[in-house]
Amino acid sequence: MDISNEAGVDAFSIIGPTTIIGRTIAVRILFCNSVSIFRHKVFRILKFFLRGGRVLLSPFVSLLHPRNPQGILVMVTTMAFLLNRYTSLKAKAEMAYRRKFWRNMMRAALTYEEWSHAAKMLDKETPKVNETDLFDVELVSNKLDELKHRRHEGSLRDIIFCMRADLVRNLGNMCNPELHKGRLHVPRLIKEYIDEVSTQLRMVCDMDTEELSLEEKLSFMHETRHAYGRTALLLSGGASLGAFHLGVVKTLVEHKLLPRIIAGSSVGSVMCAVVGTRSWPELQSFFEGSWHALQFFDQMGGIFTTVKRVMTQGAVHEIRHLQWKLRNLTNNLTFQEAYDITGRILGITVCSLRKHEPPRCLNYLTSPHVVIWSAVTASCAFPGLFEAQELMAKDRTGEIVPYHPPFNLDPEEGSASVRRWRDGSLEMDLPMIQLKELFNVNHFIVSQANPHIAPFLRMKEFVRACGGRFAAKLAQLAEMEVKHRCNQVLELGLPLREVASLFAQEWEGDVTIVMPATFSQYLKIIQNPSNVEIQKAANQGRRCTWEKLAVIKANFGIELALDECVTVLNHMRRLKRSAERAAAFSAISSSPPSKHLLAGTNRFNASKRIPSWNCIARQNSSGSVDDDVLAEASRLYQHIVVGSGRNSNRTSNLSHTYDAGSECDSPEAEDWTRSGGPLMRTNSAQMFTDYVQNLDAVDPEQIRASENDSIVAASSSSHSITVTEGDYLQTGRTHNGFVLNLVRGENLRMNSEPEDSQNESEIPETPESVQLDSPEKDIIDGESSASEDGDAQANLIHDHE
């Protein structure tokens, strides 16, 4: 058979099982077969479950039958519950969104009005907390009712007894920070209690009654203030992050909540120096624009200059630029001079380079002669950033000399090493213990901007806000554990002692304002911040302080009322003594001229005294007390004097005991600050001061009754001195007595008339600087010797033996 004509099969060879097309077709057929088998299996499984589900759902389906009312009721109730749940969740979500919106508005606010509006709206959106869990409502309410009852009865003695018996700062835990957190205002009950106590204190201060004398009122206020305690503002370190303190202090100044005791270290000491050397009007004007120019770091220069400075001085920056800036800010004032001018207590912490010397808190009691700019420079000398500094002070002549000069009697041994000081935040960032011991401080407001502390405190606040009280307790436990381990390192003397000392200190106070620093701010921590960066940090400080105003007012309100009452009473006492002195002088002047011989010695005029080297007239010591308060006190006293016919009893007690932090409201306080320097610290000088003080307590009637005997005694004495009218006597000390140096009135008036004419009513009495004025001449018993010129100087030596 011929097969040559059969069809060819070469064209079908491309779809064979070994080709790509053939394999693709085979895979497709197999895949479709597998899907079909899987579909049948799934169908069988679903059919099985549907059969079982029908059996299970048949009772529930029967409940939905129209003839079954129970089933319909269950269905409707379930649907209503689900709808209500959905609605409540939606309302909560909307409320949370609104709270987040107002919080963002608070974080972006630039003025207190904007912030307070956002805080008020946030308070409305926030669920109310149960205040009974945070403080003793019953105790505070009962105490408030008792105070109101005693005030309505009108017994001043009962009011004083009640407040002296039980007036504490944290009554019933009403100063709990958790209670005031996120609040715009103080809780109503606590505000009523603070207002009631303040009202009764002012009522005691202003009431004119014979039941209570002015001296008794002042003693009551001083004792109550000492028992109540003081508030101090502490500013931490933080290099350029210290611009945060600007906003904190500015907010406290604007709301008149700035404490009179302020202390700090490192960059915080710079802000303390600004506050402690300016009067209240100067401080208010400082924050209006001049604070933008705070640039304390010099230009680092090139890499070779920086390396050379590090190799020679051990520091990156040159400290002379910082010293020059601080001199301009503080005007070469010492701690004592700043205290005399402003009435504020300034504290600056420094650490010694010596291993066994403890850190110090410099203030007007521990180091009155140290120059403030020197202390601030030493407190800013962080190792590696600035070199350690030597403290400078003023000597008796006013020259700036080393505070701890090397002393060695044997020249062969060589001079001792210089005592240098560095950053106080290394060992004592917040000098709480020292302030408690020296100034009776029991409440601290802390502004924390340290880069190694602030992040942990912010984290702890976040944990407390998100995790509740239990999480807050765990965070507190972790903090205590870290401090405990660091203290163990310090006690055992292990390596890294300096690092351990940074974390072993106290970080927080009763009210802690923590800086929310950003990462970009940490990168520029040792550089001069620009004006924009200073403004940003200051705004952060203001917003963080606005959040704490409620708790600060709760802690600080009664203390402010006590300070105001003490200031007003001291002002009234000065007016009273001035009026008594004027009345006594008027009575003496009305007597015959021949009887002025001894009476002239009874006038003790301290307003024209010759200030000693360490005594500056305080013209701005009223602090944050408004001028209208003092004016009201003056009007009140004038009303008292006119109504009583100027027949009030004279007071001869010129030495009262005050607490250590009294701001020297009474100029008669017998301490170093009012003693006129070393020459007036002897027993002889004290006897002479007591003698002159007793002269002021003599009544005109007693003077007239004893004039004849006194004139005879004066004429029979062989030791006398004649002083021309208008001249003044300055006290001095010798080896066996004291010396009175005569100063011509013409020279003194040329130097003192402009200042005295402006501040004569504000300068308090100081019995340490003595002036004896006489219409004709002054006579004092003792030995006298004339000067070589005969009219330039007169010396009187009196033997106390």
Swiss-Prot record:
Q: In which tissues is it expressed?
A: Highly expressed in mature pollen.
Q: Which reaction does it catalyse?
A: a triacylglycerol + H2O = a diacylglycerol + a fatty acid + H(+)
Compartments, as annotated in UniProt: Lipid droplet; Membrane
Q: Which residues form the active site?
A: S266 (nucleophile), D423 (proton acceptor)
Q: What is its EC number?
A: 3.1.1.3
| Entry-listed glycosylation sites | N130, N328, N332, N605, N620, N649, N653, N708, N759
Query: Motif GXSXG: which residue numbers?
Result: 264-268
Q: Which keywords has UniProt assigned to this entry?
A: Glycoprotein, Hydrolase, Lipid degradation, Lipid droplet, Lipid metabolism, Membrane, Transmembrane, Transmembrane helix
Q: Name one GO biological process term.
A: lipid catabolic process
| Region of interest: Disordered | 648-675, 750-801
Q: What class of enzyme is it?
A: hydrolase
Q: What is its main location?
A: other
> What is the residue range of the signal peptide feature?
none
**Which cellular component terms (GO) are annotated to the entry?**
lipid droplet; membrane
What GO MF annotations does this protein's record show?
A: triacylglycerol lipase activity
- Please list the residue ranges annotated as the PNPLA domain: 233-436
Biased-composition ranges for Acidic residues? 753-765
| Membrane-spanning segments | 232-249, 261-277
Q: Which Pfam families match?
A: DUF3336, Patatin
Regarding the membrane, this protein is recorded as: Multi-pass membrane protein
The role this protein plays is:
May be involved in the release of fatty acids from the oil body in germinating seedlings. Can hydrolyze triacylglycerols in vitro.
- Protein name listed in UniProt: Triacylglycerol lipase SDP1L
